[in-house]
From Swiss-Prot:
Has a particular type of basic domain (presence of a helix-interrupting proline) that binds to the N-box (CACNAG), rather than the canonical E-box (CANNTG). This is Enhancer of split mgamma protein. It comes from Drosophila melanogaster. Homodimer. Heterodimer with dpn. Might form higher-order oligomers. Transcription repression requires formation of a complex with a corepressor protein (Groucho). Residues 15-72 form the bHLH domain. A motif (WRPW motif) lies at residues 202-205. The lineage of its organism: Eukaryota, Metazoa, Ecdysozoa, Arthropoda, Hexapoda. GO terms for biological process: cell differentiation; negative regulation of transcription by RNA polymerase II; nervous system development; neuronal stem cell population maintenance; Notch signaling pathway; positive regulation of neuroblast proliferation; regulation of neuroblast proliferation; regulation of neurogenesis. Transcriptional repressor of genes that require a bHLH protein for their transcription. May serve as a transcriptional regulator of the Achaete-scute complex (AS-C) genes. Contributes to the neural-epidermal lineage decision during early neurogenesis. Part of the Notch signaling pathway, plays a role in neuroblasts proliferation in embryos and larvae. Expressed in sensory organ precursors in the wing, leg and eye imaginal disk. It is found in: Nucleus.
Length: 205
C-alpha cells in the first residue's frame, strides 16, 4: 500500500473520528428537544383532564404519549363505528335528541288505551324543543314513528305523530315546510264526536 493511500485513509479516519461525536451530539439534542416539546404537550393535556404531574422522566413522557395516542385512536374508531365522525357536538346532541324522541313515540305506541290528545301534546312539545335547538340552515331527519292508540274501545288507529309538525307555528316554518312533509295533528275530539254521532243517529228500523 502506497504512502498516498495511507495518507487518504488517515484523513478519512480522522474526519470520521471528529464528525461522529458531533453528529451524535446533534442527534441527542434533537431527541431532547422533541422530548421537551412532548412533555409540555402531555402536561397540558393531563392538566386539562384534571391530573397534575410534577415530574416526568423521558420514559414517562414516551409512555404517556403512547397511551394518549391509543386513547385517541379508540375514540376515533368508536366515532367511525357509530357514524358520528363528522358530527359536531351540537349536531351529535340533536341526533341523540331525535333518537330519544323516536324511542318515546315507540314506547307510547305500545301503551294500551293511550290518549291520543295527550300523546299529541307531548310530541308537539318535544318538537318545539327540537325546533329551538335546530339551526335554521340545517335540516334534521323527521321523527315519524307511528303512535298506535285505542279510541273508545274500537280498533286501533295508527297515528303518525312527529315533532316536526310543530315547525308549522315556528319562526323557521317556511324553510322547514319546504324540506319536510309536515304531518297534520289529528283532532281526536272530532273523531270521537263523529263516532258518537253515528251511534246516536235515529233510524226507523
Amino acid at each position: 500500500m502506497s504512502s498516498l493511500q495511507m495518507s487518504e485513509m488517515s484523513k478519512t479516519y480522522q474526519y470520521r473520528k471528529v464528525m461522529k461525536p458531533m453528529l451524535e451530539r446533534k442527534r441527542r439534542a434533537r431527541i431532547n428537544k422533541c422530548l421537551d416539546e412532548l412533555k409540555d404537550l402531555m402536561v397540558a393535556t393531563l392538566e386539562s383532564e384534571g391530573e397534575h404531574v410534577t415530574r416526568l422522566e423521558k420514559a414517562d413522557i414516551l409512555e404517556l404519549t403512547v397511551t394518549h395516542l391509543q386513547k385517541m385512536k379508540q375514540q376515533r374508531q368508536h366515532k367511525r363505528a357509530s357514524g358520528d365522525e363528522s358530527l359536531t357536538p351540537a349536531e351529535g346532541f340533536r341526533s341523540g335528541y331525535i333518537h330519544a324522541v323516536n324511542e318515546v313515540s315507540r314506547s307510547l305506541s305500545q301503551l294500551p288505551g293511550m290518549n291520543v290528545s295527550l300523546g299529541t301534546q307531548l310530541m308537539t312539545h318535544l318538537g318545539q324543543r327540537l325546533n329551538q335547538i335546530q339551526p335554521a340552515e340545517k335540516e334534521v331527519l323527521p321523527v315519524t314513528a307511528p303512535l298506535s292508540v285505542h279510541i273508545a274501545n274500537r280498533d286501533a288507529y295508527s297515528v303518525p305523530i312527529s315533532p316536526i309538525s310543530s315547525y308549522a307555528g315556528s319562526p323557521n316554518s317556511n324553510t322547514s315546510s319546504t324540506s319536510h312533509s309536515l304531518l297534520t295533528t289529528i283532532d281526536v275530539t272530532k273523531m270521537e264526536d263523529d263516532s258518537e254521532d253515528e251511534e246516536n243517529v235515529w233510524r226507523p228500523w
